[in-house]
A protein has these predicted regions:
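Short loop/turn motifs that connect adjacent beta-strands in outer-membrane beta-barrel proteins
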Residues: 4-7, 21-38, 71-86, 134-143, ...
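Transmembrane beta-strand segments of Gram-negative outer membrane beta-barrel proteins
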Residues: 8-14, 28-50, 86-88, 96, ...
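Transmembrane beta-barrel strands of outer-membrane/channel proteins
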Residues: 38-46, 86-92, 145-149, 203-209, ...
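Solvent-exposed loop/turn segments connecting transmembrane beta-strands
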Residues: 56-58, 230-231, 267-271, 301-312, ...
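Outer membrane beta-barrel
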Residues: 57, 61-213, 307-343
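Membrane-embedded beta-strands of outer-membrane beta-barrel proteins
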Residues: 66-68, 127, 191, 238-240, ...
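Long, well-ordered mid-to-C-terminal structural blocks that present hydrophobic/aromatic surfaces
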Residues: 243-325
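Outer-membrane beta-barrel "beta-signal"
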Residues: 386-398
Length: 398
């Protein structure tokens, strides 16, 4: 093989690989075989604000994330540790005002056009241990226990389709973040127990420490002691769900119902809070393989007396492979609506957020996603003007 041909093959292998940084000359595969999985990603979102309360403008938000996963059985070379793993995640988000489109839009934080506006700077997100019983009551991984410095958002109300979007309401907070610390910047001590009595049914519960102002950028995700002057409390989440397949095409779906109790009683927070939610994702039509149309929806209720939002709902559609020869591209559109509660401004009504986009998959490790966002009554009243945004969501996995 000529040197030129070898270079072309190497470039093609890199482009069609799993990571931008490649296989590290074989080192990545070697360490993964020993139970060490180290990976990272970069995300950037450009917001071209066409109109808003503060007029036209621009913003560019960025996030760098790093993960380290450890497989105890492979590390120790002992099969008796099969199912035990450790994990660590760290993150950086651009803290500058030029990164936050809400400088112009002035929306309630739940309806921030950017999912990367909270918990800025360097931040420790989570670390801990997870044990999945290899077989429990005849079900693979039928019992899973997780404990450590955790993020409830990664364990509950998981909607992968909603997290394709750039805005905060769908991509991170999922309604709950409008009333309690819940989104992608909230970390706390806790434990989660998940049981699958049968293959397609699960029941899980999580108990966490609640504390004052947990997503403050100044604490860097290191607020292990919680609040000293304000006092700590308990945060419980419970959820049950099913993962059925429908029809001759065996169209996959996921449906769940859950609730929470957030116990933190201080003057600023407004006392203990609770709420209930239900969500579903369903493939409704299959074109070929993974190609086809999927739908998702979520609803969330909370008492209006001490919550900013008494009701929130989101729904959307995602079509994979609509354009010929672009089998992995995604066409998406969704809407989110939040009804303000008594804890918000007395005159507040609803905010409505619409986002539509098209994700171009360049390869396994990079995408470009142009999108449009429309925000009606961004802060719940006509006092803040509507907003229109054109943007581009970029991603690279390394």
């Amino acid at each position: 093989m000529s040197p030129a041909r070898a270079e072309v093959d190497a470039a093609a292998g890199w482009w069609h690989g799993q990571h931008m940084t490649g296989d590290w000359f074989g080192a990545r595969t070697a360490v993964e075989d020993r139970g060490v999985d180290l990976r990272g990603r970069w995300r950037g979102i450009y917001f071209g604000i066409l109109d808003s309360e503060q007029g036209a403008g621009n913003a560019f938000a960025q996030e760098l994330s790093f993960w380290l996963d450890l497989d105890a059985a492979k590390l120790a070379g002992w099969e008796g540790l099969r199912g035990l793993s450790g994990f660590v995640e760290g993150r950086w988000r651009d803290p500058g005002p030029e990164a936050n489109p809400n400088t112009y839009v002035e929306a309630d934080s739940l309806f921030n056009p950017s999912r990367y506006a909270g918990g800025t700077g360097w931040r420790l997100m989570n670390f801990g241990l997870r044990y999945a019983v290899p077989e429990f009551v005849g079900v693979k991984d039928g019992l899973v226990v997780t404990a450590g410095w955790l993020q409830p958002q990664k364990e509950f109300v998981t909607q992968p389709l909603a997290r394709l979007f750039a805005n905060n309401a769908m991509g991170s907070a999922e309604g709950l973040g409008g009333n309690i610390p819940y989104g992608s910047s909230f970390s706390t001590w806790g434990g989660v127990l998940e049981v699958r009595p049968v293959e397609r049914l699960y029941i899980k519960g999580g108990l966490y420490m609640s504390y004052f102002n947990p997503t403050d950028p100044a604490n860097r995700g290191l607020h292990f002691h919680g609040s000293r002057s304000e006092g700590n409390g308990l945060f419980f989440m419970g959820e049950t769900g099913i993962t059925p397949e429908f029809g001759a095409e065996r169209l996959p779906g996921s449906y769940s119902f859950g609730g929470y109790f957030y116990g933190e009683d201080n003057e600023e927070f407004g006392g203990n809070k609770y709420g209930f939610y239900g969500q579903g994702e369903q493939m409704v039509w299959r074109e070929d393989g993974e190609q086809g149309l999927r739908a998702f929806s979520l609803f969330y209720f909370a008492p209006p007396e001490n919550n900013d939002f008494s009701f929130y709902t989101q729904a959307g559609l995602v079509y994979q492979g609509l354009v010929p020869q672009r089998d992995r591209d995604l066409l998406m559109a969704a809407v989110a609506v939040g009804q303000y509660g008594d804890a918000a401004a007395p005159s507040a009504g609803q905010s409505v957020f619409v986002e539509a986009g098209y994700q171009v998959r360049l390869n396994d490790w990079a995408f470009v996603q142009p999108f449009v966002q429309l925000v009606t009554r961004p802060a719940g009243t006509s006092a803040v003007g509507d907003a229109a945004i054109l943007g581009v969501f970029l991603g690279v996995d390394f």
